[in-house]
């Protein structure tokens, strides 16, 4: 991700004063220069759009070739009942622009399948929501080829997931030095500390701060769906406490890849989840029958409160990496709307 950073105007500095105080002038300028593509303006896509538009992103292109339906009205706040039957981007463009007239917005209703490599080359980051899994893998293959970071998010009623592929990302964090100083070296299979520098507090020389540079490596979606495991990454006690949502989400994604368009039965879902439990190294008992039933019933349903949580999490991480702040998420999140757990797994 190599952006040409533009300086902020005095008006922009005044407009974004509060968030500049939070994450700094450089981070805000980075966001002002970023070009982001958002695919599908559903419930999650609407939440992400709202957050990054208000944050002061420079350029946002929304690609959505869907019409507004009555089913959209309960979960998508940019549209109303008067918009049913219209192109979604035609119905929402003025409302989105009103959030922040300063940003450059582009709307595109062309079918995703018609977009070629040249189209994607213009962006610094891609966010894809509510995708068929084969489409997501195809886009991920392309974004990797072009070295473009990618977020993929989807929901099924009370349950949701986020996949992140930043390919390779160097993050910098600063923290107060503890009794045991941070050292260079691997901290997980996907992350390594590559540099640690220190500075003294200007007001208290007894305090030392560490600036930690971390190399984050990511894996493509098709590889995650083929080889994801938690073996040797967690203790036996931790493996027994893994949420049902993880094997069920992976099962649903894998089933969508292999059996596109076909309804999934309880028996099939249970068998697939058991296979994933074995692959992950977790006991099959973590998958509960009532969760399987809920997963099947809620497949493909958008629920506004879940979209708000997932959209907010994705938008925050997008802002972090565009602003080159803090360590990014790495690399697979699931959300359980029943327990409100949202664990992060590193595959």
Swiss-Prot record:
There is a cross-link at residue 35 (Glycyl lysine isopeptide (Lys-Gly) (interchain with G-Cter in SUMO)). The keyword Hydrolase does not apply. Keywords: DNA damage, Isopeptide bond, Phosphoprotein, Ubl conjugation. GO terms for biological process: DNA damage response; protein sumoylation. The keyword Zinc does not apply. GO terms for cellular component: cytoplasm; cytosol; nucleus; SUMO activating enzyme complex. Could be involved in a ubiquitin-related process important for DNA damage tolerance. This is DNA damage tolerance protein RHC31. It comes from Saccharomyces cerevisiae (strain ATCC 204508 / S288c) (Baker's yeast).
């Amino acid at each position: 991700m190599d952006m040409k950073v533009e300086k902020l105007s005095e008006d922009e500095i005044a407009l974004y004063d509060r968030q500049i105080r939070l994450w700094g002038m450089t981070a805000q300028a980075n966001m002002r220069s970023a070009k982001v593509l958002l695919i599908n303006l559903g419930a999650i896509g609407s939440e992400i759009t709202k957050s990054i538009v208000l944050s002061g992103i420079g350029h946002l292109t929304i690609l959505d070739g869907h019409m507004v339906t009555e089913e959209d009205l309960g979960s998508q706040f940019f549209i109303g009942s008067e918009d049913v039957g219209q192109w979604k981007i035609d119905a929402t463009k003025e409302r989105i622009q009103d959030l922040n007239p300063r940003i450059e917005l582009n709307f595109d209703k062309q079918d995703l399948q018609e977009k070629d490599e040249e189209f994607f080359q213009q962006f610094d980051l891609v966010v894809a929501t509510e995708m068929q899994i084969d489409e997501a893998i195809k886009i991920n293959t392309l974004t990797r080829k072009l070295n473009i970071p990618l977020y993929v998010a989807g929901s099924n009623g009370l349950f949701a997931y986020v996949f992140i592929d930043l390919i390779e990302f160097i993050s910098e964090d600063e923290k107060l030095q503890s009794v045991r100083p941070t050292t260079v070296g691997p901290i997980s299979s996907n992350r390594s500390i590559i540099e640690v520098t220190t500075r003294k507090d200007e007001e208290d020389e007894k305090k030392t701060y560490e600036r930690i540079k971390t190399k984050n490596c990511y894996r493509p979606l098709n590889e995650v769906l083929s080889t994801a495991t938690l073996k040797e990454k967690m203790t036996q006690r931790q493996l027994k406490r893994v949420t049902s949502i993880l094997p069920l989400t992976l099962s649903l994604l894998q089933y969508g890849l292999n059996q596109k368009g076909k309804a999934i039965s309880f028996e099939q879902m249970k068998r697939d989840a058991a296979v994933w439990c074995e692959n992950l190294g977790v006991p099959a008992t973590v998958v509960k029958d009532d969760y399987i039933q809920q997963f099947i019933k809620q497949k493909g349903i958008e629920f506004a409160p879940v979209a708000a949580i997932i959209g907010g999490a994705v938008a925050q991480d997008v802002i972090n990496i565009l602003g080159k702040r803090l360590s990014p998420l790495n690399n697979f999140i699931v959300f359980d709307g029943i327990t409100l757990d949202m664990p992060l797994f590193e595959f």
